[in-house]
From Swiss-Prot:
Responsible for synthesis of pseudouridine from uracil-55 in the psi GC loop of transfer RNAs. The keyword Transmembrane helix does not apply. It comes from the Bacteria. Signal peptide: none annotated. It comes from Rickettsia africae (strain ESF-5). It catalyses: uridine(55) in tRNA = pseudouridine(55) in tRNA. The lineage of its organism: Bacteria, Pseudomonadati, Pseudomonadota, Alphaproteobacteria, Rickettsiales. GO terms for biological process: mRNA pseudouridine synthesis; tRNA pseudouridine synthesis. GO terms for molecular function: RNA binding; tRNA pseudouridine(55) synthase activity. The active site is at 39 (nucleophile). Belongs to the pseudouridine synthase TruB family. Type 1 subfamily. The keyword tRNA processing applies. Its EC number is 5.4.99.25. This is tRNA pseudouridine synthase B. Keywords: Isomerase, tRNA processing.
Length: 345
């Protein structure tokens, strides 16, 4: 098996690039990528894509992520974490009540300025390189979403608080920590940071590796996750021989809504159940049973009548991932085509 995901746990003290080198030494010559760089001082989930799974990395980068982080109040560092130099201090330390209550202010859509010590580029140069040289770094604000934020623990003696957050892509926890502290009329920096989840990948079943000698290639592959795992919550269509051939060779491919739709899950609607139809804030849906499997699925009525475009879906051929793309009415537009099977014509 050469196309799969690995749920790797990056330890604190090594870079994401160093962990990539370790995994490459174990697996040998194969295409490898990862979804979402972690700082050297951070630890946690770093999903690895192997082989054709690298074509899906962009989906994981867009996925929600969860973190647990600890803030030290009363000081600010130039990097936003304990690796930097202290550049300011303040005697004002928040109370436990304040540390808990401030969370509600940050839930929702937030504008955040990335830290100077980041991998973002300024005129083609990494921001952290400019910051290390003492140069002024100006980065544009970006819009992010904080889905959840709560205080887990407050240590008055050490002036620290530990928080949990679920957030969108592009969120910098070091900046979030600084903004939390400022909102509490204090200063702060991150002393511990752990990423606990990226999409479907969670820390409780992650593989922990510190050196290439700790695990063999076979043992690592035994812990692999199928390439389709991250696609479980989006629409999937099953292609016939002729449809699969059209997709493989980049030709126009049409699907019949009545015959080809098999699965639709997790539509982002809040629905109110009404008989055998469901009313949504954005669309109507129809409950239908798939006679071939006995399973019940929900189809938007717009899709049922071929009036709705689908931004992202995937196509199977003989049970194996063939392509991902979009659907414009009944026409499939391929974004990525995968070579996972030799069973082709």
């Amino acid at each position: 098996m050469s196309n799969y995901w690995l749920n790797i746990y990056k330890p604190r003290g090594i870079s994401s690039a160093q962990l990539v080198s370790i995994v490459k030494k174990i697996l040998g010559k194969t295409k490898i990528g990862h979804a979402g760089t972690l700082d050297v001082e951070a630890e946690g989930i770093l999903p690895f894509a192997v082989g054709e799974a690298t074509k899906l990395i962009h989906l994981l980068i867009d996925a929600r992520k969860t973190y647990i982080f600890t803030i030290k109040f009363g000081m600010q560092t130039n990097s936003g974490d304990c690796a930097g130099k202290v550049i300011a201090t303040k005697d004002c330390i928040p109370s436990q009540e304040e540390a808990y209550a401030v969370c509600s202010k940050f839930i929702g859509n937030v504008t955040q300025i990335p830290p100077a010590f980041s991998a973002l580029k300024v005129n083609g140069v990494r921001a952290y390189k400019l910051a290390r040289e003492g140069k002024k770094v100006e980065l544009k604000p970006r819009n992010i979403t904080i889905y959840d934020l709560k205080c887990l623990n407050f240590d008055e003696k050490n002036a620290t608080a530990t928080y949990y957050t679920e957030c969108s892509k592009g969120t910098y926890i070091r900046t979030l920590a600084e903004d939390l502290a400022l909102s509490l009329q204090s200063l702060g920096f991150v002393i511990e940071l752990r990423r606990t989840q990226v999409g479907i990948f969670k820390e409780e079943n992650a593989i922990r590796i510190k050196s290439p000698d700790e695990i063999t290639k076979n043992a690592l592959e035994e812990k692999s996750i199928k390439i389709e795992a991250i696609l479980d919550d989006i629409l999937v269509l099953d292609a016939t021989d002729s449809q699969a051939q059209q997709i493989k060779y980049g030709q126009k491919c049409l699907f019949n809504y009545e015959k080809d739709f098999r699965h639709l899950a997790k539509f982002a609607y809040r629905e109110e159940f009404k008989g055998n139809t469901e009313r949504s804030t954005t669309a109507y849906t129809l409950v239908r049973e798939d006679a071939s499997t006995g399973l019940t699925y929900k189809l938007p009525l717009e899709v049922e009548f071929g009036k709705m475009s689908v931004d992202l879906l995937w196509v199977r051929y003989k049970g194996t991932l063939l392509a991902i793309g979009s659907l414009n009415k009944s026409c499939f537009n391929s974004l990525r085509v995968f070579n996972l099977t030799q069973d082709f014509f």
